[in-house]
């Protein structure tokens, strides 16, 4: 839904929500909410994406947060983490100050993830834990935002069972947070503002970045792939690319501010530029432009194999600041399962892509995502995933048990793989993941690698930690002054998922800002 199409800015759910009786809440979503529905969601609007470069917070809202504090709890992916940075930026522009003490915060926001059932259960548990705070301090505001807010079943559950929540808003209208807050302060009922699947591209939103070493940079929003297990196309909307000049300007500003690494974000970054109607411009072109900017390291995530072009491979192969690490989710190694998943590629085409990548980028580190126990997955089909892992030799993988999500096509399939079978398969897969990770790590012993030092180790404050360009965790002892810098470290010991080493020296990146 574009800004001018919005017919209602919010919905107040009246005091009747306190009643325990069952009730039809669908009427509250008219005009501002469209529940996840594959048939409807695939009917992507033909309207051109509207770009708002003139975003400003109305002066009447400035000062709203004076002498008030906020706390944001974030679940989920990097996109959610970046959304939290934007939400924090808006709140600070309103006068609020961040706090880490949930017991004293005046505004508590839970930025949610809808990708797996376990994540949703954690959120509901979190909301429930806040009920006592609302009783003790009725003037605080509690809000739920993020992907779960885009699901009608979730919002219904909050309306019926969690009266301690004051506001619910979605992924498309974060820039309306000042108005939502004002409404929540004035209203005696819950404020719900959840927009449709369309969405605009809003530039110049304030941000409070987490740290000054690494930064997220959105290059696009939404996804049009509609993998049958995934709720994201419903919660994040259609694919919308930012203009390349806006992205490049943001990266240049980050370079001037001294950031050492950026990650280009999108639900499917390989689709970048397909919706730009006035120019032919893709991720390869964007990477080429950013490679000329003085950011020592540039990453991108997440990739879909279907859209990975030879042009992108060629640009990455040129080296420079584009790191030789590609995360390429495969999900399954069996063609029948891939077809049911709606992945749009085959085992053979995936392996062909891997071959082309390795031929052009011999030093590449490939990692992946895999789902175990998809509906109807047989033992033989699962074993094809294991053999594909052997053929590729991934250096790491994020592995998951299949989690049924309401509103997706897969939710209509019978989840007929027993839980004990899923867990046994996951255990076998993870054993293989650990085996290949150990092989990859062992190759570093005795080598000197460049590490971006990010801070102290989680296990020992006297030890520093950082990552190589291939995203390998390295622990080493060095002066605290090295935090935020690129350093050389000699690897003394290779563990299964991390490396231990000795500090050698600081590295000065030889790049010129353009």
Curated annotation (Swiss-Prot):
Domain Radical SAM core intervals: 209-440
Residue span(s) of domain MTTase N-terminal: 68-186
UniProt-listed Enzyme Commission number(s): 2.8.4.3
Chain positions recorded as [4Fe-4S] cluster 1 binding sites: 77, 113, 147
UniProt-annotated stretches for the region Disordered: 1-21
Reaction(s) catalysed by this chain's protein: N(6)-dimethylallyladenosine(37) in tRNA + (sulfur carrier)-SH + AH2 + 2 S-adenosyl-L-methionine = 2-methylsulfanyl-N(6)-dimethylallyladenosine(37) in tRNA + (sulfur carrier)-H + 5'-deoxyadenosine + L-methionine + A + S-adenosyl-L-homocysteine + 2 H(+)
Keywords: 4Fe-4S, Cytoplasm, Iron, Iron-sulfur, Metal-binding, S-adenosyl-L-methionine, Transferase, tRNA processing
Descriptive protein name: tRNA-2-methylthio-N(6)-dimethylallyladenosine synthase
Source species taxonomy: Bacteria, Bacillati, Bacillota, Bacilli, Bacillales
Gene: miaB
């Amino acid at each position: 839904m574009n800004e001018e199409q919005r017919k209602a800015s919010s919905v107040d759910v009246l005091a009747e929500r306190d009643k325990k009786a069952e009730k039809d809440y669908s009427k509250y979503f008219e005009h501002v909410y469209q529940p996840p529905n594959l048939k409807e969601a695939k009917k992507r609007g033909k309207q051109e994406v509207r770009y708002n470069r003139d975003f400003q917070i109305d002066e009447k809202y400035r000062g709203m947060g004076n002498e008030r504090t906020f706390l944001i709890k974030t679940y989920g992916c990097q996109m959610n983490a970046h959304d939290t940075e934007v939400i924090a930026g808006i709140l600070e522009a309103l006068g609020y100050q961040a706090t880490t003490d949930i017991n004293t915060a005046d505004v508590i926001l839970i930025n949610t993830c809808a990708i797996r059932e376990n994540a949703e259960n954690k959120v509901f548990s979190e909301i429930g834990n806040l009920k006592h705070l609302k009783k003790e301090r009725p003037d605080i505001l509690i809000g739920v935002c993020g992907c779960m807010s885009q699901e009608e079943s979730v919002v219904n559950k909050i309306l019926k069972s969690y009266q301690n929540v004051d506001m619910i808003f979605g992924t498309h209208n974060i820039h309306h947070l000042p108005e939502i807050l004002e409404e929540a302060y004035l209203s005696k009922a819950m404020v719900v503002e959840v927009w449709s699947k369309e969405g605009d591209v809003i530039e110049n939103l304030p941000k409070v970045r987490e740290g000054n070493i690494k930064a997220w940079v959105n290059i696009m929003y939404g996804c049009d792939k509609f993998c049958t297990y995934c709720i994201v196309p419903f919660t994040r909307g259609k694919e919308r690319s930012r203009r390349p000049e806006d992205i490049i300007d943001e990266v240049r500003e980050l370079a001037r501010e001294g950031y050492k690494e950026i990650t280009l974000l999108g639900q499917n970054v390989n689709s970048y530029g397909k919706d730009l109607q006035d120019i032919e411009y893709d991720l390869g072109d964007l990477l080429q432009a950013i490679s000329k900017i003085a950011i020592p390291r540039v990453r991108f995530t997440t990739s879909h194999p279907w859209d990975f072009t030879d042009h992108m491979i060629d640009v990455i192969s040129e080296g420079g600041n584009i790191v030789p690490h590609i995360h390429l989710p495969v999900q399954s190694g069996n063609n029948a399962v891939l077809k049911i998943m709606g992945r749009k590629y085959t085992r053979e085409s995936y392996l062909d892509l891997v071959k082309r990548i390795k031929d052009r980028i011999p030093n590449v580190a490939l990692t992946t995502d895999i789902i175990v126990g998809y509906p109807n997955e047989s033992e033989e089909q699962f074993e094809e995933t294991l053999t594909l892992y052997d053929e590729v030799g991934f250096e790491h993988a994020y592995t998951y048990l299949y989690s049924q999500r309401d509103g997706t096509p897969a939710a209509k399939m019978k989840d007929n793989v027993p839980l004990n079978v899923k867990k046994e398969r996951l255990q076998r897969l993870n054993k293989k993941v650990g085996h290949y990770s150990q092989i990859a790590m062992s190759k570093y012993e005795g080598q000197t690698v460049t590490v971006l030092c990010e801070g102290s180790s989680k296990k020992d404050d006297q030890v520093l930690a950082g990552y190589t360009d291939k995203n390998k965790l390295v622990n080493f002892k060095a002066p605290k002054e090295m935090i935020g810098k690129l350093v050389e470290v000699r690897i003394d010991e290779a563990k299964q998922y991390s490396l231990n080493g000795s500090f050698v020296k600081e590295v000065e990146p030889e790049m010129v800002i353009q």
